[in-house]
Amino acid sequence: MKTAIQKAAAILCLALLSACASPAEFQNMVVTEGIDTAATQNSAFKDSIVVKSVDGGEETNPMWTSEISSQAFEKALIASLENAQLLAKLDENAPYRLRVTLLEVDQPLFGLDLTVKTRVRYEIIEKDSDKTVFSEEIPATHTATFGDSPFAIQRLRLANEGSAKNNIAAFIERVITVSPEMSGGNVALK
């Protein structure tokens, strides 16, 4: 009888622990595929960006919902920029500084398929002139299905990670096709 109660208590504890929300993990937000390396070779930003700041993320409360922290997003962004050959080799020599703000992480409260929408502002500032040469808000979404995980809390984390990864991928795709152009002290994007 005592053994059965101990087993039941252990199972209950495991069930409660598995129901706790976990934060988005940076390694699952890193863009590793789909980068147009040929376009990167011709990009004005090749090997020239350093991440200055990432703000707007939230820490996960284990008793509530999974969130994307600023630190996890920054780690994923740095690794993704490195994979895309956009990250400067030395921070102090980087001609461009990247400032990022997570403006919105829109999450559903419940559902079988959970879609998370992220909206992130990316600003690239030229180091020497302190001029903004790129400033865009980029939206992205990702849907995690019941097939990805039967647990809603885990599906939400997967949707967070996928949306953040898609957002970083959209930024990289956009920035490798843009060239900063200085003319008379004004900055224009071509």
Region locations from a protein language model:
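Surface-exposed short loop/turn segments
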Residues: 21-30, 84-135, 139-158
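Extracytoplasmic/periplasmic, Sec-exported soluble proteins
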Residues: 65, 69, 73, 114-116, ...
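Sec-dependent bacterial lipoprotein signal peptides
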Residues: 1-20
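A generic structural signal for short, solvent-exposed coil/turn residues
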Residues: 9-12, 41-43, 90-92, 130
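A structural "domain/chain start" motif
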Residues: 20-75, 176-190
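Extracytoplasmic/secreted envelope proteins and their assembly/folding machinery
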Residues: 70, 74, 78-81, 165-168, ...
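Compositionally biased, intrinsically disordered linkers/stalks adjacent to structured regions
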Residues: 151-190
